[in-house]
Amino acid sequence: MAEDVRAEIVASVLEVVVHEGDQIGEGDTLVLLESMKMEIPVLAEVAGTVTKVNVAEGDVIQAGHLIAVID
């Protein structure tokens, strides 16, 4: 079953670490966000394959924004 990864805060996307098709493990960093001059990693809560990456470096995203989908 697909797992949506969503932003918990308003932030800028500093770095996209994974790409569609990548195999990832639980706890792997998916993207690095920046908010209030702090770098915040977004970690995978499940292992699987990244089926969608919905952000790019430099994007400003809102809380609840879909970052990626893991299947």
Swiss-Prot record:
InterPro entries: Biotin_Carboxyl_Carrier/Decarb, Biotin_lipoyl, Single_hybrid_motif
Record's keyword terms, sorted: Biotin
Pfam families: Biotin_lipoyl
Membrane-spanning segments: none
CDD domains: biotinyl_domain
Residues modified to N6-biotinyllysine: K37
Biotinyl-binding domain segment(s): 2-71
Name the UniProt record assigns to this protein: Biotinylated protein TB7.3 homolog
Species assigned in the record: Mycolicibacterium smegmatis (strain ATCC 700084 / mc(2)155) (Mycobacterium smegmatis)
